[in-house]
């Protein structure tokens, strides 16, 4: 029996040694990758490593007050033939200028001119940068703190029924909000806001929505205004009823426009708790997915977004530690 056991041990010992060496190699590789900041399985990480590497992604932000607000009212009823209703909410007296059929190329050239040549602080400045390459222009005076509904429509005299197939050379509607009083332009860093709005027509029936919003700063920069996404309660009701057939058609149109990835579940403003601990208030926004879902205590333990599982490249706090402590004192 002893001889048989020794022979068996001799035959299988190389496989045993190979398995041990391979296991040690995997464990060592995981630890080294963890030290270098690569994502490794949780079992090979410790809390100190995770906290240190994630904190390095913190992005410094500067708070800026935006004096402009623009939304679409009853977007389901908007079309090129019937027009669109816009709701404004501005902190100061402003002017709303609407450009129908604005050239896509000229618009982005105008934004670049704001950076290098002159500032787009008035409608006249934008029109000069556009070389008046648009079909129709409308302008309205907006009183501060008044949520006014502005009805805009492309005149039938232009003879335009659609803007052609995708990709298009003209945006259906570009809305510019500027400060009416010149003295107010010295108060705010943001001096104007450009909104690119899609309006359905006979050729392209994607529902009416704001495609892009650009904040124009007095210092010569412009930034794409992005929406932050927070977790929604399952009991929340959708903003509008939609059948499955309508949803599939809308999704196919979004894919053609390259916007299918931008669809997000409805957001409920009352949802403010951390999605992990369900205790602390949400204070951290993860980039590039823009999910606001973690509190100050939980943010240091995640390299991936807990909502969409996308890797976190950067993150920033919605408010500083002093402001958070002040809110806690007020609620207690």
From Swiss-Prot:
Its main location: nucleus. The lineage of its organism: Eukaryota, Metazoa, Chordata, Craniata, Vertebrata. SUPFAM superfamilies: RING/U-box (SSF57850). Transmembrane segments: none annotated. This is Cell growth regulator with RING finger domain protein 1. A zinc finger (RING-type) spans 274-309. Keywords: Cell cycle, Endoplasmic reticulum, Growth arrest, Metal-binding, Nucleus, Zinc, Zinc-finger. It comes from the Eukaryota. Able to inhibit growth in several cell lines. Pfam families: zf-C3HC4_3. InterPro entries: CGRF1, Znf_RING, Znf_RING/FYVE/PHD. It is found in: Nucleus; Endoplasmic reticulum. GO terms for cellular component: endoplasmic reticulum; nucleus. Induction: By p53. GO terms for biological process: negative regulation of cell growth; regulation of cell cycle. One of its GO terms (molecular function) is zinc ion binding. Highly expressed in testis, lower levels of expression is seen in skeletal muscle, liver, lung and brain.
């Amino acid at each position: 029996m002893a001889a048989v056991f020794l022979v068996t041990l001799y035959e299988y010992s190389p496989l045993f040694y190979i398995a041990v060496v391979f296991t040690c190699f995997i464990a060592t590789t995981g630890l080294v990758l963890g030290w270098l900041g690569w994502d490794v399985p949780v079992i090979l990480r410790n809390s100190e490593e995770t906290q240190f590497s994630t904190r390095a992604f913190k992005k410094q932000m500067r708070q800026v007050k935006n004096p402009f607000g623009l939304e679409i009212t009853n977007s389901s009823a908007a079309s090129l033939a019937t027009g669109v209703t816009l709701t404004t909410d501005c902190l100061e007296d402003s002017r709303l200028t609407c450009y129908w059929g604005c050239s896509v190329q000229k618009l982005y050239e105008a934004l670049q001119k704001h950076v290098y040549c002159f500032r787009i602080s008035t409608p006249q400045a934008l029109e000069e940068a556009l070389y008046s390459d648009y079909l129709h222009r409308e302008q309205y005076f907006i009183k501060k703190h008044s949520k006014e509904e502005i009805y805009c429509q492309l005149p039938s005299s232009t003879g335009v029924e659609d803007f052609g197939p995708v990709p298009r050379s003209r945006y259906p509607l570009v809305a510019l909000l500027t400060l009416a009083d010149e003295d107010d332009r010295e108060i705010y860093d943001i001096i104007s806001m450009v909104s690119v709005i899609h309006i359905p027509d006979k050729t392209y029936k994607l529902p009416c929505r704001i495609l892009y919003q650009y904040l124009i700063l007095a210092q010569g920069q412009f930034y794409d205004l992005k929406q932050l996404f927070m977790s929604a309660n399952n009991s929340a009701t959708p903003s509008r009823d939609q059948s499955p057939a309508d949803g599939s058609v809308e999704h196919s149109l979004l894919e053609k426009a390259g916007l299918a990835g931008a669809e997000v579940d409805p957001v409920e403003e009352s949802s403010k708790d951390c999605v992990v601990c369900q205790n602390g208030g949400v204070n951290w926004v993860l980039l590039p997915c823009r999910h606001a879902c973690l509190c100050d205590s939980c943010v240091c333990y995640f390299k991936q977004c807990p909502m969409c599982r996308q890797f976190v490249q950067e993150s920033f706090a919605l408010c500083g530690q002093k402001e958070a402590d002040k809110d806690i004192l007020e609620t207690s």
